[in-house]
Structures are given as C-alpha cells and as structure tokens.
C-alpha cells in the first residue's frame, strides 16, 4: 500500500505538474522509490554522523529533493505579504522574479541544507552532503528514466501492466476507503487535490463552479472540497468570500446532486477536457468534484486557465472560478456585480448568481459544458440566470468576508476594469443591462461601497464602503444602473501603480480608522496595484483609468482627476473645467460632507459613495454614486463626463484636495464632473484621502482629522499629495495636509437616497456646466456673473466688484492650480452647493492660489470655464445638491433647488466667490477667498507665494443668514484666519484667530508650488437656507425636508462649522488641530450617528470643531447676517471693509484669537473629551475666566477694529446691546438666571438659548436657561425678551432682512427647538418659533453638541464665536458688553450655526 500511497502523494503531484500522464509518472516514481533504498540507507548513515536523526530527516530530505513540484504561488503570496508588511508594495511580478531567481533544484537544495542545518549543531559538511545526495538521486533518476524508456519502447512489461495507473490507484484507494460523505467521489476532484495542479484545476474548478463566489449561496467548489484543497486553491478561496464557505455546504449538497449526473459524464469529459479543454466541460466536472478537478482535468483546464490568465493571474483562482462560472454562462452581468475579479473575466461571473439555486447551478453546469465561446454568447441571453443572481444577491447582501483579507490573494486578478477581487467579492453588483459590465465593474472597483441601481432600479450596494489606503470607508453608493456607464471609467480609478509602489503602509496607517483588516491593505486587495492593497489600489487608482471613467457613473468624481484639475464643478459643457474645478486635487477630494444623512443610507456613507466609501470616498455620506442621484437619471454619469453631475451628485461633503478641502454635495459632484476621468483621477490620481468617516478614528487625536462632515463626521482631511488615500481623506491631512490631484482617488459624497436622480443629474448638469471651470488659470479668465459660492450657498449675493473679475475658480483648488497640496475648496463648494441649493458656495480651504477655492456655487460660477454654462446652471439650480446631502430638497428637489438658486440670484457673482486670487475682484479682496465649507461661508486666503487672496465680492442681497454669513468671510491666510464682516474685503479682514500652531507650508505643495500647504482653520457657517432663503418654494407643500431649513427663516440651515486644515506636519504635532465633528450627537461616541433633527429633517451633523480645530468663532455681527437689509449689509460690508484692517490687528495675538476657542473647548470639553482638550494646545488657555476675557477682548477688539462689524454692525451691536440690556432687565426681573440668559438670548437668543441650556455653565444660562427657564417660568418675560430681541434684532440685523416676527420666530424657534422650555416663547412668537423650531430641531442637535462643547458658553455664543472669531466665542460671557455687537449677527449666524 505504501507504493500506492507514495504514488498518490508524490506521484499525483508530479502527475498534476506533468499533466495528463498519471500512469507513467506514477510508474517512474514508484520505480524510483523502490530504488531509493540504498540511497536512503546511505543518507541515514551520513546524517547520523552529523548527529541528525536519520529516521526523520533522511525521508524528509529525500522527499524534499525528489518532490518536483514547488508552490510558487504560495511563495509569491508569502513574499508579497511579507513585502506588503514591510511596506514595499511589490508587484506580483517582482516576487515571481525573486522566486524564480533560483532554479527549482537550487531551491530544493537550499531547503534541504537549511533543514539539516537547523537540525544539526554542525553546519560544516551539510552542503557537501546535500550535493552528494543530489548527485546520487540524479543518477538514480537517470537510471530509472532509462529503464522506463526501455519499457515504454518495448511492449508494456507485465510489471508495468500490473502497476496501477494513478487513476486506478485512486479508485482502488477509495474502494478500500470509501468517502464518509454521501457525495459521490469524483476521481478528477481527488486527482486535482492530490495533484496540486493549481492553475488548471483551479481554473477548471472555477470555470466549472457555476456558483459565483460571492453571489451564490453555495461556496465555490473548492470550498466544497477539503480545507487542504482550499489551501491549495487558497487564491480562489481568498477571493471567495467567507459566506461562500458557508454556502459550501449547500453547494456540497448541490454538488452531490450534480455530481451524480456530472460524475457519470466525467470520464468522457475528463478525456475531452484534456483534448479540448472546454471550460464548460470542465465545469460540470468541477461542479461535481467541487472546486478541484482531476489532475488530468486540471491539465485540461490549463488551456482554460491560460485564457483566464489573460484576465486573471493564476493566483486568482477563485476569481477564475467565478469568471469561468460567468463564462459558464450567464453571468457576465453577474460578474459585474460579483466583483472586479469576475468583472476581469470578460464572461464574468454572470452564472454566479444563478448558481445560488440548484436549478441555476445545473444550468450553469450545462452551460459549462458548452464551449467558452458558447457560454460567452449565452451570457447576454442569461437573463434568467441574471435574475437568479440578482435574487441571490438581493437575498444575501454580500458582506465583507475575512477570507478576502486573511486568505492570501495569490495573483490578484487585475481585470480590465481593474476591479479588485476584494471589491468583486465584497459586493456583487446586480446585472445592469443599462450599465455595461465593465462600467459597473469599474464602478464597483472604484467604489466598493457603491450601490449600483439597475435600470430596474435594483440598487446594489457594492460595498458597505470603499477601502482607501487601508481604510474601509463605509459609504453605500447607490448607482442608478440606468445611468450609462461608459467603460470602466466609472470607478476604476486610474490605479497609479507608481503611487502604490511608492506608498508604504506606514503612510496608510491612519486609514485604519475604518477598522479595515490589515489584509485589506494587503497587496492582494488591490488588483490593479499589484504590490498594493486593493484598497490602496482603489484609492490610488490614478488618472490612467480616470479617463475611462468619464462616461462611467463614477460619481466618485471619476472626472475629478481630469488633468489633475478640479473636475468637481466641471460643467457638462466644459469637461476640463469640471475636472479641474472639481478639485484641484481630486486626491484632495478626500472628504465630503455626507450631508444627505437620512435620505440615503447609502448616501450617508461618509465619503464618496454614500455610507460606504464609494470610489470617491468614505466615502461616507458623500456617496459618489447616490442611488437617487444616479437612479433618476443616467445623466449623472454622462454628467460626470460633462462635469455637470458632479456638483449635484455630491451631497454636501467635503472634498479634500491636496490643496483644498471642498465640501461637495455629492449631487454636485455627481458624475456630472465633466470628466468622469477627472473624478477618477481625483480618486485615483492621488491617494484619495477619503477619510471615510466610518470611524471616529477620523477624530482620533493621532488621526489629526478634523471631522467636519456636517452629516458624517467626515473629517476635513488635508493630506499631502503623497498621502495615502485615507490621509487624503483625513481632513487634517495628517501627514500631508495637501492633496495632489493624484492624491484624491475617491471622493464619495453622500447623496440622500431621496434625492431624485434626475434632480441630481439636473443639478449636477447645471452645476457642472457652470463648473466647467478649468484649472485655476482658466477660471481667472472667466468672469462669472453667476452667484458667488457664498451667494449660492447663502443665497447671499456677494457684491461682485466687477464681472470683469475673472474668477479663477480654483476648481476646488483645481488640480492644475499650483498648490495641489493646498486645500482645494471643492469640498466646500459641494457642501455649499448642496446647502444653498445650487449655490453651493463651498469655500475651499485655500491653497495659496485660490485654486483650492473654486466657486462653490456650482451654478453660480462653478469655477467652470464656461461662464455661460455656469450662469445657466446657476439659474437652474440642480436639485441634487441640497437634497442629496441633507435631503433638504426631498420635497421639491429639483424645483426647489432651482428656485433656490434662481431665487437667490444673489450668487450671480462674476466668478466663483472664492476661487481666484481676488484679482478679478476688487483690489481689497484680491488676496482673500471666501469659501463655504460644509455650508459654512468662509473667506479663505489663498496663499500664493505672493499672498493673493481670493475673495468673494460682497453679495448683492442677503436673503438669509448665510447671506449675512457671506458678509462675514473667514479668510484663512497662511497662518491666520481672517473674518471679513459684511463681506468686507481685504482691508476689513479681521484675523479671526491665528493658528495655535503656525501653519507650516506643507512640503507637498506639488500642486501649489507657492501654495501654502498650511493647515487652515476656518469657521464655516453653513446656511442650508443659503440661497434657499431667497428662493421661494414654488409648491408651498414642497418645503425642505428640514423644517429648520426654512426658506423664510434666514437662520435655518446655518451650520456652524469650525474646522482646521492642517498639513500633515502640523497634524502630527498639533493634537489641537484635530477638529471634532459633532454629528448631531451629544457625545463623541455618537459622532458617527448623525442625529436626525425633526422628522422630515435631513440629518445634519453639526460639526463643532473644538478649539483643537483652531477655529476661531466668527461673530454673528461679523457675519452681519441681518445687516438689516441687503443695502445695509452691503454698506455694512463696505464699512467693515474699511475698518477691518484694525480687526486683523486685533487678533495679531494668535493666542487671543484662540482664547474664545479655548473657552469653547472648555465648555465643549465633554464633547471632545478631556483628553483631547488636555492634549490640545488650547487647554492651558481653556479657562472660563480666560475665555471670557478673551471673548470680551475679542469683542472689544472687534468693536475697536470696527472692521469686524461695519458701522451697521456697530449699530447693530448697540441695538443688540440695548436690546440685550432691555432683555436682561426684563429677564432679570423675571429670572435671575435669566439675566445671563438674556444676555445670551439677546445675543444669540433662539438658537443658543435652545441648544445652550444643556451647556449653560456660565453664560449658557443666559441664553439657554433664560429662554428655557424663563419661558417655563415667565412666558411673558420670554415674550418680552422676544419682543425686545425682535426690536434689536430688527434694528441690528434683521429689521431690514427679516421682519421682527421672523427674528422673533427664529429666536423662539431656537429656544423651542433647543429647549422644550422655550416653547412658551415659541407660542408667543409662533411664526418665528416654527421656523426656529425647525431650525432648532436641527440646530438643537448641533447646538446640543455645541452646547456640550461650549459648556458654559451659551451655545449661541459658541456658535457665534465660531462664526465670529473672537467676539462670538465670548458672546455668552460678554453678551451684554460685546454681545450687543455680536448679538444680532451672532444670533442669526449663531442660530444658523447652532442650527447646523
């Protein structure tokens, strides 16, 4: 029996390698074994001389040397894994070369020598012994070969006749030892197991197995086999998801059924297989046999394997299996769904879905019998199979399987579409007749979490998220399969092998935020990038494939990467502009605001693709492809090419470009990017730092991520171009604050599912058309009459100094712009676009060229080259933006947004407000950029080496708080953040705060050579009302989902975001820089779960960036939202602009600027955690007294500067102060606590009061308690207060802008919203209360967070502070003093911020 065993063990493997002649091989092996006796005896003696156990080692060494098969795959995998661990992303080819450097014989000798040396104390003589042994064995073998030759030449000797063939031996063995399982034994399977003819057997098994690895209930055949077999087929197993293994049992049953029929066919098939190697034939056998086929069948499969090798490397056996399954039949489509591996195989794993059912499996087997060509033909006809697959997939959502990561992925199959196997198995996409398999595959490649919806409206969640630099970014992206995806452009990010190879794991470490298995980082993870993890590969995919994505539904901003330009805002008319516009570095488009929180769970993905990081990133709320975005229209994808879809597509999310952070509404970013390619580039070019906010890790201190995502906690990541994708996502850009266009591989904005795809498409188209802005250089030439971003977002028309001002819309720091590392403002743009509906004024973190600041207004100026297109887009606001992120527009969606944009023609600013160095703008503004981040309007200083600032011209009308906010521009200069009240420009810019750490220029300013790759901190006012305040809802019923998003209420939808962008250098050193995102949750633990404010409300993530974020509050007065009227506002702006220079002086002391933030931090400590505060550099200053002083100082300094508040603001301050005093008096009479509250209330009244009561430590009482308790205690007092407030509100801010009732309403609303106790006030001022309540519902959540964060500071003050750098911070404390100054604006703005 030993000979038989030996033959089986030794002979079969050799047989598998030798292929179809098991008999002769076995005979020769047997004869050789018989002749080994003398050699073994001699070897034993020699070993004994060396002190080595002869019994053990003689047989082992002989086995080593005689074994003629070597598992290169295993070695390569091992090497790859090791190399990956070492951070050297080596391509499989390299490892192969290394492996093949030594001949098999040399390797065996080496192994034997090593083995003996390990067993012997003496190392001398071992090599000689082995050499001699090898010589003896060679002699023996030659002798045996001669004998065999003679025997073969002559008639078969009786001995030979008697010797059983390998097959006979197997049969004899199983007769003697029948299998325990009922499953009929397939000799071929057994042979395969023994033979280890991996490629052949695997390929055949894969082809034979009709079950798609991920899609089918039954696991791949190999799973059916033994673990050992699985090990041999480890690559296939690796590709096969764990669930497949679970399915393996059912598959076993099926196989047993099939095997009964197929086994009978096997003998013939076996022979035929060897001859014809038809995939189909092999498959039936493999089905019956499981994954393994007989050795000969495996040999037969070799031809098959070769074919598959075109698409797949041998290692991707599972993939091959899937592919062959697909070839078996039907599943090219399924293959698309199954994954990149299947997709790589042209036939795809269409059959995999069908294999879920026995019947389908049988069909597959039959199809497998067909020639490959036949099966390929049948693919199109396999609708039934497709349906089965779809059903199976629908029944079972593919979950990420540990095997994907734990099992070595041998050769990663790099499908043409560059789908990673992991992606493939991770989510199988439904067959989408509308989508080409490649397109869908590409999409899934780029966005693992992308949800692809069929034209049948099957929404496929490709993945929960995307892997970015080892980060698994959760972001279900819903892609409307109806959307026309051209080729693989969709999501196949041009995997930049260069990047991958150049990037080391160390760079990717921070992406572990997502708790991704290290294996995900495994090079196996990345098909395209052989040495790189699939995730990295996805993240790093570069522009190579980006071009392909143009037509694809790469909502992931495939076009973003266009020419390294920002494609986000690309208009369909100008693809180049869109790309560049989209993000200077799509790589920087790491972050989005996943503002469309509730409407699309998938959209909720932190990054690019909804919840799961779509190719464009976590991710996260910002689903690159939102089902609703894409579902309604295929346009988004086409729009991507056009670039128009991009804006609408991206829900409000922040896109971190190397040089800019852009909040995009995914809708805005929607494939509308003129160049799907661009988005792909954005995704693939750079490691996209899609900090998929799947984890709070983004907020982890070491992450240095400021998670600002309004909805998703998405951090604004600034990462250097070289950053790993996840870093890119990290708002902090921990190591490299700037993205290169290359850096951003994926931007996945969240899109609310609710968002109508058509709306998104329309919105995207409009925006992208407008955003066809080219690189920064192109944009400057454009004069945009479009609304400025601020206008769009805020619905505030910024004064356009002159349309002649060429907005060099920095396509979100268009990649072309010099400071690629700089933060692009593309992110902001989308957010604003969404927030303001069409006028997304996302201020972009400015890299020095204002490129990072591209017009956020997709419609307004979209930084798009085509000003006309932009104008058009502005006029026709896309519905997608606002709605997708926040689901704000669920009701009216497109019309609403259009209305918002149209109504808020405010945004008709010449160019993008923020995009260019202010050259096109008036001189004062030349060096400023206004930006809206996450709905926050900020003015950013773009940092060219010359220090130009891109500024937003003052808005014409300020219909909403955002407009008011627009007046207050946060300008972030290299190290300073300036706030321009009332749209005051450069002269009036007041330094909001100086970064605690000076922003150092990143070493990564690839994009912006002069670009300041410095962390920026800014305070964002997010006014979802934005343009909406101006826009009237055509249908009264169609109101924003968020009652808080009240068009009539200027305060509603103002998000106060403080975020700091900090370059990686700073990030690592400045824990304080790490912004904390408060996602509508009171505690950090809740950060990831945005709270839904109001039933219909969109979930807003209040992003409260702690002082750590280095945000200085912007005072409401600075924002001068009310300015009483547009004229007032403008005058205010003008006035502010004059005095503003003093403001800058005011905050010359960076610490002074930080004090309010510190105060906030102290108050907000419970939100951020003591550790963060303590670790933060602000902590020492976080003392209430210090905070109060600083706040007062800030207010005083602001007042002194008077630049902060224009005269009107000053008047407002006086009015506010008076009103505050009055309120205080009345409230004091009513309630002692109310006094402070009144101050606070007066200052911020509604929002703060409502939100603040929880945080009423010192002053919070004033606003929150006052409103809450006094309301409860003395409604009259509250009413009086409200009236007073109304008076001063009216007088100060809103008398012109909003009727007192409105202010009152807002005030009451905030109170009611934030504190139930405020309801009495609400009752008293019902109209205002309603709005405020709606607003407050949203704001209350945010404020609650903020309140916790701000602690004693009244929430409104906190928001106010954020809004207005210093004064706002202490508004609560200095409510009566400086509060008056800030009260009006701060209430409005604070309310807005609080609201968000």
Curated annotation (Swiss-Prot):
Name of this chain's protein: Uncharacterized protein KIAA0232
Organism placement in taxonomy: Eukaryota, Metazoa, Chordata, Craniata, Vertebrata
Phosphoserine sites (modified residues): 817, 1083, 1197, 1339
InterPro entries in the record: DUF4603
Keywords noted in UniProt: ATP-binding, Nucleotide-binding, Phosphoprotein
Compositional bias of kind Low complexity: 198-221, 286-300, 1365-1376
GO MF annotation: an example: ATP binding
Binding-site positions, ATP: 88-95
Region listing for Disordered, in residue ranges: 146-165, 198-388, 1113-1137, 1347-1396
Biased composition, class Basic residues, residue ranges: 312-327
Basic and acidic residues: compositionally biased ranges: 242-268, 1386-1396
């Amino acid at each position: 029996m030993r000979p038989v065993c030996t033959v089986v063990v030794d002979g079969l493997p050799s047989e598998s390698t030798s292929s179809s002649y098991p008999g002769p091989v076995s005979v020769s092996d047997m004869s050789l074994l018989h002749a080994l006796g003398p050699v073994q005896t001699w070897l034993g003696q020699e070993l004994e001389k060396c002190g080595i156990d002869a019994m053990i080692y003689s047989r082992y060494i002989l086995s080593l040397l005689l074994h003629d098969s070597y598992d290169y795959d295993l070695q390569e995998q091992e090497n790859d894994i090791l190399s990956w661990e070492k951070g050297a992303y080596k391509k499989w080819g390299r490892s192969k070369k290394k492996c093949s450097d030594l001949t098999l014989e040399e390797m065996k000798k080496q192994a034997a020598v090593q083995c003996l040396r390990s067993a012997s104390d003496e190392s001398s003589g071992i090599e000689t012994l082995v050499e001699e042994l090898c010589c003896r064995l060679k002699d023996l073998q030659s002798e045996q070969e001669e004998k065999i030759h003679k025997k073969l030449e002559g008639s078969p000797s009786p001995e030979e006749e008697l010797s059983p063939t390998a097959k006979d031996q197997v049969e004899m063995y199983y007769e003697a030892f029948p299998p325990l399982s009922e499953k009929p034994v397939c000799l071929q399977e057994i042979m395969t197991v023994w033979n280890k003819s991996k490629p052949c057997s695997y390929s055949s098994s894969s082809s034979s197995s009709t079950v798609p690895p991920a899609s089918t209930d039954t696991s791949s055949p190999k799973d059916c086999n033994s673990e050992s077999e699985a090990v041999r087929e480890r690559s296939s197993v690796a590709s096969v998801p764990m669930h497949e293994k679970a399915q393996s049992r059912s598959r076993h049953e099926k196989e047993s059924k099939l095997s009964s029929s197929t086994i009978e066919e096997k003998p013939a098939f076996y022979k035929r297989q060897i001859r014809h190697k038809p995939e189909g034939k092999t498959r039936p056998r493999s089905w019956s046999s499981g994954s393994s086929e007989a050795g000969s069948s495996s040999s037969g499969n070799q031809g098959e394997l070769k074919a598959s090798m075109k698409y797949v490397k041998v290692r991707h056996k599972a993939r091959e299996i899937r592919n062959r399954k697909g070839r078996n039949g039907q599943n090219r489509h399924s293959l698309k769904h199954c994954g990149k591996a299947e997709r790589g195989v042209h036939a795809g794993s269409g059959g995999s879905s069908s294999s879920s059912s026995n019947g389908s499996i049988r069909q597959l087997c039959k199809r497998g019998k067909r020639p490959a060509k036949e099966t390929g033909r049948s693919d199109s006809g396999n609708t039934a199979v497709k349906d089965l697959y779809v059903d199976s997939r629908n029944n079972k959502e593919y979950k990420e399987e540990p095997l994907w990561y734990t099992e070595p992925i041998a050769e990663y199959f790099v499908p043409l579409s560059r789908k990673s196997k992991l992606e493939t198995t991770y989510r199988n996409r439904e067959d989408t007749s509308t989508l080409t398999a490649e397109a869908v595959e590409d999409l899934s490649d780029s966005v693992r979490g992308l949800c692809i919806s069929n034209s049948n409206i099957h929404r496929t969640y490709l993945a929960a998220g995307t892997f970015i630099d080892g980060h698994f970014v959760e972001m279900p992206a819903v892609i409307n399969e109806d959307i026309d995806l051209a080729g693989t452009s969709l999501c196949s990010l041009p995997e930049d092998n260069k990047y991958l190879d150049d990037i080391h794991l160390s760079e990717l470490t921070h992406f572990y935020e997502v708790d991704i298995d290290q294996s995900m980082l495994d090079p196996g993870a990345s098909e395209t990038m052989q040495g790189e993890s699939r995730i990295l590969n996805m993240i790093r995919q570069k522009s190579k494939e980006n071009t392909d994505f143009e037509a694809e539904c790469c909502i992931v901003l495939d076009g973003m990467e266009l020419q390294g330009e920002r494609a986000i805002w690309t208009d369909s008319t100008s693809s180049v502009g869109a790309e560049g516009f989209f993000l200077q570095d799509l790589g920087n488009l790491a972050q989005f605001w996943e503002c469309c929180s509730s409407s699309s769970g998938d959209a909720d993905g932190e990054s690019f693709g909804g919840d799961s990081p779509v190719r464009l990133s976590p991710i996260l709320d910002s689903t690159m492809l939102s089902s609703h975005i894409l579902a309604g229209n295929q346009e988004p994808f086409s729009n991507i090419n056009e670039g128009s879809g991009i804006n609408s597509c991206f829900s409000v999310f922040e896109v971190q470009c190397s040089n800019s952070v852009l909040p995009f509404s995914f809708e805005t970013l929607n494939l509308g990017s003129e160049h799907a390619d661009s988005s792909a580039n954005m995704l693939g070019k750079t490691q996209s730092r899609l900090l998929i906010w799947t984890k709070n890790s983004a907020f982890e201190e070491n992450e240095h991520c400021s998670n600002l995502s309004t909805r998703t906690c998405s951090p604004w990541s600034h990462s250097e171009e070289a950053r790993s994708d996840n870093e890119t996502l990290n708002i902090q850009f921990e190591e490299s604050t700037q993205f290169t266009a290359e850096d951003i591989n994926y931007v996945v904005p969240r899109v609310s599912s609710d968002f109508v795809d058509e709306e998104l498409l329309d919105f995207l188209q409009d925006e992208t058309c407008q955003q066809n802005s080219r690189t920064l250089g192109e944009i400057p030439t454009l004069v945009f009459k479009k609304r400025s971003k601020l206008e769009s977002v805020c619905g505030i028309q910024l004064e356009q100094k002159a349309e002649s001002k060429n907005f060099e819309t920095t396509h979100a720091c268009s990649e072309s712009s010099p400071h690629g590392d700089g933060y692009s403002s593309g992110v902001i743009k989308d957010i604003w676009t969404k927030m303001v509906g069409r006028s997304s004024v996302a201020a972009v973190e400015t890299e020095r060229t204002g490129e990072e600041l591209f017009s956020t207004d997709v419609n307004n100026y979209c930084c798009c080259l085509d000003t006309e297109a932009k104008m058009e887009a502005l006029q026709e606001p896309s519905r997608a933006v606002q709605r997708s992120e926040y689901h704000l527009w669920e009701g009216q969606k497109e019309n609403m947004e259009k209305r918002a944009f149209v109504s808020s023609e405010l945004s008709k600013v010449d160019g993008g407000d923020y995009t260019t160095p202010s050259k096109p703008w008036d001189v004062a503004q030349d060096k400023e950029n206004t930006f809206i981040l996450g709905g926050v309007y900020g003015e950013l200083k773009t940092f060219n080496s010359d220090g130009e600032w891109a500024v937003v011209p003052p808005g014409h009308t300020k219909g909403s708080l955002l407009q008011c906010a627009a007046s207050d521009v946060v300008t972030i200069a290299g190290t300073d953040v300036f706030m321009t009240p009332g749209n005051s420009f450069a002269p009036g810019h007041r330094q909001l705060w100086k970064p605690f750490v000076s922003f150092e220029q990143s070493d990564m300013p690839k994009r912006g050579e002069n670009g300041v790759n410095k962390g920026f901190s800014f305070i964002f006012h997010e006014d979802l009302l934005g343009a909406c305040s101006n826009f009237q809802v055509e249908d009264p019923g169609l109101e924003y989902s968020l009652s808080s998003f009240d068009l009539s209420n200027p305060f509603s939808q103002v998000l106060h975001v403080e975020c700091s962008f900090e370059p990686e250098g700073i990030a690592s050193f400045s824990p304080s820089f790490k912004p904390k995102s408060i996602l509508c949750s009171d505690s950090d633990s809740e950060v990831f779960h945005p709270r839904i404010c109001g039933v219909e409300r969109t979930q807003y993530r209040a992003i409260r960036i702690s002082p750590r974020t280095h945000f200085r509050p912007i005072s409401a007065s600075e924002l001068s939202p009310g300015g009483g009227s547009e004229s007032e506002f403008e005058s205010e702006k003008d006035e502010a602009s004059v005095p503003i220079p003093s403001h800058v002086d005011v905050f010359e002391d960076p610490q002074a600027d930080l004090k309010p933030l510190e105060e906030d931090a102290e108050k907000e400590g419970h939100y951020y955690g003591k550790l963060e505060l303590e670790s933060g550099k602000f902590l020492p200053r976080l003392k209430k007294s210090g905070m109060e002083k600083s706040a007062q100082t800030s207010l005083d300094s602001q007042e002194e500067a008077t630049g902060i508040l224009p005269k009107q603001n000053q008047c407002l301050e006086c009015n506010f102060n008076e009103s505050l005093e009055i309120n205080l008096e009345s409230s004091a009479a009513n309630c002692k606590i109310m006094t402070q509250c009144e101050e606070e209330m007066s200052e911020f009244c509604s929002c703060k009061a409502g939100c603040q009561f929880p945080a009423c430590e010192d002053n919070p009482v004033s606003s929150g308690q006052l409103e809450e308790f006094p309301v409860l205690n003395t409604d009259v007092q509250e009413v009086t207060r409200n009236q007073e407030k109304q008076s001063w509100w009216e007088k100060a801010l809103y008398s012109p802008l909003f009727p007192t009732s409105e202010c009152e309403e807002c005030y009451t609303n905030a109170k009611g919203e934030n504190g139930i106790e405020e309801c009495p006030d609400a009752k008293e001022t019902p109209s205002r209360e309603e709005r405020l309540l709606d607003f407050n519902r949203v704001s209350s959540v945010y404020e609650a967070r903020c309140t916790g964060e701000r602690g004693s500071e009244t929430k409104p003050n906190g928001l106010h502070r954020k809004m207005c750098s210093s004064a706002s911070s202490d508004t609560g404390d200095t409510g009566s003093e400086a509060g008056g100054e800030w009260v009006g604006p701060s209430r409005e703005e604070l309310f807005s911020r609080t609201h968000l």
